[in-house]
A protein has these predicted regions:
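Basic/polar, cationic surfaces and motifs that engage anionic cell-wall
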Residues: 1-25, 62-63, 68, 79-82, ...
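Secreted/periplasmic proteins that engage bacterial cell-wall peptidoglycan
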Residues: 15-70
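A broad, low-amplitude sensor of folded, mature protein cores
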Residues: 35, 55, 77-80, 86
Length: 147
């Protein structure tokens, strides 16, 4: 799995270590053309330690590192302590997910399952928190209903 190191600087004193990992939560960025660095800066300006997602998948299918994998995320209120957050570039209210993103998303889920040596549950953000994110059923698209 090729994951591009985004070389992001975090407020280390605010990063908490995740003790267990049970699931993956899928998101869309709600914007097109936004880089992982721009999201990181936006989240820093909100007072967070940095980007809340662990991975960011651009429309070309390139996967970028976000928040360190060992750290508690900031992407799904009430479910950050035991989940990994994956964000897909795009506003899926009007943009279609690209085939490159689908392939990269499937590969990333398999990579994470191997990394944690178990089959992680997969959720759309809206299944765990009242939001329209990610608008489309990413879970079904990426897992063929097998999670």
């Amino acid at each position: 799995m090729n994951i591009i190191d985004s070389k992001l600087n975090f407020k280390k004193d605010k990063l908490l270590v995740r003790r267990m990992t049970e699931a993956i939560v899928l998101h869309h960025s709600c914007s097109k053309g936004q880089t992982v660095q721009q999201i990181h800066l936006q989240h820093l300006n909100q007072g967070w330690s940095g980007i809340g997602y662990h991975y960011y998948i651009r429309r070309d299918g390139k996967v970028y590192s976000g928040r360190p994998q060992f750290a508690v995320g900031s992407h799904c209120q009430g479910h950050n302590k035991d989940t990994i957050g994956i964000c897909f570039e795009g506003d899926f209210r009007k943009d279609k997910i690209t085939q490159e993103q689908i392939v990269a998303g499937k590969e990333l889920i398999e990579y994470l399952n191997e990394s944690f040596n178990k089959k992680l549950k997969v959720f759309n953000h809206g299944e765990l928190y009242p939001t329209m994110c990610p608008v489309i059923n990413l879970k079904e698209i990426l897992t063929n209903g097998n999670y």
